[in-house]
Amino acid sequence: MAWMTYISNWFEQDDWYEGLQRANMSQVRQVGLLAAGCQPWNKDVCAASGDRFAYCATLAIYIYQLDHRYNEFKLHAIMSEHKKTITAISWCPHNPDLFASGSTDNLVIIWNVAEQKVIAKLDSTKGIPASLSWCWNAEDVVAFVSHRGPLFIWTISGPDSGVIVHKDAHSFLSDICMFRWHTHQKGKVVFGHIDGSLSIFHPGNKNQKHVLRPESLEGTDEEDPVTALEWDPLSTDYLLVVNLHYGIRLVDSESLSCITTFNLPSAAASVQCLAWVPSAPGMFITGDSQVGVLRIWNVSRTTPIDNLKLKKTGFHCLHVLNSPPRKKFSVQSPTKNHYTSSTSEAVPPPTLTQNQAFSLPPGHAVCCFLDGGVGLYDMGAKKWDFLRDLGHVETIFDCKFKPDDPNLLATASFDGTIKVWDINTLTAVYTSPGNEGVIYSLSWAPGGLNCIAGGTSRNGAFIWNVQKGKIIQRFNEHGTNGIFCIAWSHKDSKRIATCSSDGFCIIRTIDGKVLHKYKHPAAVFGCDWSQNNKDMIATGCEDTNVRVYYVATSSDQPLKVFSGHTAKVFHVKWSPLREGILCSGSDDGTVRIWDYTQDACINILNGHTAPVRGLMWNTEIPYLLISGSWDYTIKVWDTREGTCVDTVYDHGADVYGLTCHPSRPFTMASCSRDSTVRLWSLTALVTPVQINILADRSWEEIIGNTDYAIEPGTPPLLCGKVSRDIRQEIEKLTANSQVKKLRWFSECLSPPGGSDNLWNLVAVIKGQDDSLLPQNYCKGIMHLKHLIKFRTSEAQELTTVKMSKFGGGIGVPAKEERLKEAAEIHLRLGQIQRYCELMVELGEWDKALSIAPGVSVKYWKKLMQRRADQLIQEDKDDVIPYCIAIGDVKKLVHFFMSRGQLKEALLVAQAACEGNMQPLHVSVPKGASYSDDIYKEDFNELLHKVSKELAEWYFQDGRAVLAACCHLAIDNIELAMAYLIRGNELELAVCVGTVLGESAAPATHYALELLARKCMMISVCFPCVGYSVPFCYVNRNLAADLLLMIPDNELHLIKLCAFYPGCTEEINDLHDKCKLPTVEECMQLAETARADDNIFETVKYYLLSQEPEKALPIGISFVKEYISSSDWTLDTIYPVLDLLSYIRTEKLLLHTCTEARNELLILCGYIGALLAIRRQYQSIVPALYEYTSQLLKRREVSVPLKIEYLSEELDAWRACTQSTNRSLEDSPYTPPSDSQRMIYATLLKRLKEESLKGIIGPDYVTGSNLPSHSDIHISCLTGLKIQGPVFFLEDGKSAISLNDALMWAKVNPFSPLGTGIRLNPF
């Protein structure tokens, strides 16, 4: 296996624990990502290959990949190697993992998508690579061209590597818009020019330069640029060309003649882009430039076959993907009889749209629009598979939450717009009118005024009224100088400050009256109003100084000047919790903390390697400060000692803005030059507070005052307004205050993405009155008893909109005329069924169905079913009414599920359960009566199936909380809890489980057990914050408190006490708290149990004594003896092994324990593999077997396990479970052999059932699918790149995914490095 090469040296040595670090993971977790839109500047900015497509923002390329299980595309990676505008992208035709991209800094990059790294780079090209393309006839050759040429050919590797100039393609008379290689004819290439002409080069033929200009331009020097150009994939000589004004032509490159000129329906329409449809010969699609109309054409017709309006804004570029095969249902087609009787079934033609005889080919078009919108349109089904309506296409300089709504985030961008996003759905809610130049900074009006002030590079400042959608005020005091920062005073809503490159910080009222102009010796970059004094403002200046001004006096001199930075100061920020404290970030790479009252710099934070931009104080923890830098990182600081607590590497470029909302103080948003906005959860930084809340500790251990909290070594305490407000509200309550406390703190500490939704559902289940549900409840996942009610009222509100259809039909063939005549005769003869079948043959289903009841209701129903089957076969939405009319709920639900429309499926299944759909009782087999209850039963099962599928979809997308919501919505509490635990949302699981009570108890207890394991290591989680020893002791107590919340807790408490490494006195204290005998008594109890030959008790008490290592040989020999017998089961040996694994780490690592330790690791590895099979942790089963085999091979041990047997067992498991593990494109299925079946059957006999049903299946933490990007790690378990959160092992180098770490730790407590150190990723 790949991973062994990484860590095999661990298995060689026996002194590996020397110099080990602590295993760790980032405390700051990425929980949301808002991708940029597609840039509108350059032509070839979207591309596709196989099951991936990509598009370019200005500085980053976004790559989406098909998830075969759900048949949907997901963001897979972000490439941000370019530092200047990207000009073009081209996918390699020979290798689906490679693409080439160019940028305006004369750079071409070859990037490998699978490995997410640069394969080759061509620097300082002659001229800007404005257009580029892989050569079709050579493996690794890329051609690129600047605006005027020549064409450069770059051979990337091999003996001929280097750049040469194409021998003919140079000295053009007009700039090049684009060029295209012929896909079959070697070396044939066409260029489109700004003057409307084409140049064609074909080796061995005469070169044709500047030919085929549109006829209207002949003899003039007017320009009509070529906007699109594509060779016909089925011809050697034909190509489609589009000119901006002249439109579309099909031309012949050999005879240099125009074959067809295509006509658009109106003179106003013009085409922006085009693409051939590979699955339909002769068919192509175009996108209009003014409005988002997609037109479908066939070369045989000069007018479009169909016109689909997809969006208000015009197209920018198009690319057609060959669709992946859909999951289809098998529907039996009618048997084809050799003779035709009056009642035999007709074979219908494919359905035709109203106006023409054609069916859209299967295929997906990647559509990019001028407003940055990107979508994937399914042409066959005529629906969006995915659409991101609009996005920033450039660097985002600033982001801020709306003061009165933590769900709305505003962003300001280089692209000249401010956009407001709903962070729960990551969709744009409002966008400013635009054309403002570059917007560097924004500031919300205080309270609910619903206005945003923006500062721009050339056009002064403005106020945008978000609701009205218009600019209501402009400020031009700085002239055309750039405004780097704008700050609306939150204590006095009439004042706005701006600072500019002209050296002034100007304070004015919102109606434009200037109050102060503070002159600085150089440009001013940052300003911030004090949170405690409405008249104090601080500025950051290019002269390296920070100044503080007092606005209440008329003086224009600063009160204080702080010097110390060695380069320009950018942002300054006042602490919200500590009066007189402010911080500043500088180009010298440091952050300085200043104390206004002491006139001094009280701390310097060193760590960034480039200028610092974003700065943010936490609004609850007074010493927590976060900074973002041009070194692409975000750093979290404890300003008490000036230590860096965490560094986040996920952004792919400079980090500019950081923000959080006081009512969600541990959710942070960041924005960057990589043109993404990312959401982060900082909750892990305050884990002790969270657990104090769960354990119902006193308020003193949750909320504190600032002076106490900033003492070094103090555990984190909440000191902000929000926590104080919650406390006040709770102290007012008389009843169920614990429930409210858990809910309110949970909502404050959890990131967006479903926790509010989850709590609403918990309230519904606990019987809360519907009138208390919040306004937005119906937007989320509703409890099923509300689903139909809310959807019905929604339907009444919606009014119908008439859609206009473009006309155009084809003459009807003669055969159809004859059939119609025949049908009329049959009808007059009373042969209704024959008439109906002929109508079916003509495709006139509606006529057939309207007459069919004249034959019989049974025949009508059968005809309806045939129609439904045909529509499903063709994947048409029209099937829905047919299925509903005949009550065929199952077919409809399966249809929706196969298309991934899980929410639709859920709605139908619920309607059926509520009895809104009547199955037609037509004919019943003799003696059987199908009661309504049985139908109800059927529908209920269907409902659960759909809910489960929807939950699974959310879950594998890294949205465990929403997955839990799906289960709560149908009252499935057990599964809802299981999904929270599998998503590692342990604190949330305990909160919700505590409120839900009895029905959630088993899962709540398991979550408490895992949380206690987390607590056991909290001092390890915070190695850098320097918590003192008493704090570690506090955490042992905290773990004990959690375990005491579990009714049957003795064994859990024993494990906790066994693992605790203190002095005897501390250990006895803990024993006392856990109601266990003292260390000395345990020693005697162990000796007694040993004399009685009671293995479990002996092991238990030795572990609790001063000499826990005595337990090892006793426990291990018991397990070895058991495994040697043939009929052992997991449940007999696992309890002993599990207990042994809690031996104190420093005792286990003693040299005298080497052999026992190695045997314990091997047994835990093997039993871990079996547990992983039982829990269906497919991704780590092979690694656990491999780990056990490696230890067996490399360590001196005598264990009744053979490497050969382990590999047979693994092969048997693979063979017998491959049908469930196979993904669509894997190798062909080979059935398991008889011996493999026998081995696997024995294995299953040993495993028995998992006691907690719901927790079977892999773990997926929140954000598992989000691409990180400057930070790529290879998993030492799989050898593959880790997507999502990473967990570093104790050597500080080896990494595994957090998901794998969680699953591993649940089945085998010891690290995969074989060191004997416990793994704690919780």
UniProtKB/Swiss-Prot annotation:
Gene3D superfamilies attached to this UniProt entry: YVTN repeat-like/Quinoprotein amine dehydrogenase
UniProt keyword Repeat, yes or no: yes
Repeat (WD) residue spans along the chain: 81-121, 123-164, 171-211, 221-261, 266-307, 391-431, 434-474, 478-518, 519-559, 564-604, 607-647, 650-690
Biased composition (Polar residues): 330-345
Keyword Repeat: yes
UniProt-annotated stretches for the region Disordered: 328-352
InterPro entries: G-protein_beta_WD-40_rep, Quinoprotein_ADH-like_sf, WD40/YVTN_repeat-like_dom_sf, WD40_repeat_CS, WD40_repeat_dom_sf, WD40_rpt
Keywords: Repeat, WD repeat
Protein name: WD repeat-containing protein 17
Organism: Homo sapiens (Human)
